Regions:
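Recognition helices and adjacent regulatory flanks at domain boundaries
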Residues: 3-4, 18-19, 44, 48-50, ...
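Residues in soluble alpha-helical coiled-coils and helical-bundle/repeat scaffolds
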Residues: 36-40, 44, 62-65, 82-83, ...
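Solvent-exposed, amphipathic alpha-helical segments
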Residues: 2-10, 56-63, 90, 94, ...
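Hydrophobic alpha-helical connector segments
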Residues: 44, 55-88, 140-144, 168, ...
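Hydrophobic/aromatic-rich alpha-helical bundle segments in the mid-to-C-terminal region
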Residues: 105-109, 113, 128-174, 181-199
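Helix-turn-helix
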Residues: 2-40, 44
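Amphipathic alpha-helical segments used for helix-helix packing
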Residues: 70, 82-106
Length: 199
């Protein structure tokens, strides 16, 4: 969507209806007639996000098959909007609006809740298919969402490698202890230290 693409390139202060119109290939008057204000345009763009979450997760399931692979790859793909520090800064600027403006906050809360619910479903499937140990999947879904957000901000500060690689490593690190046979798969140096600590 033209609005979403421009939000990655322009901050809320810099974004104009003319920018979005040019990206969409229409004249600004068309957007002014339809939306009236920039705020209304942004609200319209954001309102579609919560309802699209189940479909997004379903498409990823069909693509990757494995519940855990689906989870990791989908979170990585969804970080594409902030693949540069500049795009991340723009995203954080829009997040400020989401936290202050009640209408935007309601949409953001609904989107976050939908993502957490779909993440839990993937974790439930991962347990059922013996990819994960039995665990509190609701709590793990919460942790995944928190690690995802924290890792993205962490990467924007350290700027080592790509965001995709940084995020994948963070999510896999969180999930590692929950995998079946996790201790057996740990690096030898680490398992050696664990054995020495037991003596």
């Amino acid at each position: 969507m033209a609005t979403t693409r421009m939000m990655q390139r322009r901050s809320p202060v810099d974004l104009t209806l003319a920018d979005v119109a040019k990206e969409a290939g229409v004249v600004p008057a068309t957007l002014i007639q339809r939306f009236g204000t920039k705020r209304s345009l942004l609200l319209a763009a954001c309102r579609t996000a919560p309802g699209g979450v189940p479909e997004q997760f379903g498409a990823a399931r069909a693509k990757y098959g494995s519940p855990l692979k689906t989870l990791i790859e989908l979170y990585v793909e969804c970080s594409g909007f902030a693949s540069t520090p500049e795009a991340m800064a723009n995203g954080l600027a829009y997040l400020q609006i989401d936290l202050i403006d009640p209408e935007f906050h309601a949409i953001t809360l609904a989107q976050f809740t939908a993502i957490r619910d779909e993440t839990k479903k993937l974790l439930d499937d991962a347990v059922a298919s013996d990819e994960l140990k039995p665990c509190d999947t609701a709590d793990l879904a919460r942790l995944i969402q928190q690690v995802n957000g924290g890792a993205m901000l962490d990467w924007a500060v350290y700027r080592k490698g790509s965001l995709a690689a940084w995020l994948r490593r963070s999510l896999e690190g969180l999930l590692a202890p929950y995998r079946l046979g996790a201790e057996a798969d740990l690096p030898k140096a680490r398992t050696g230290r664990m054995q020495n600590n037991r003596r």
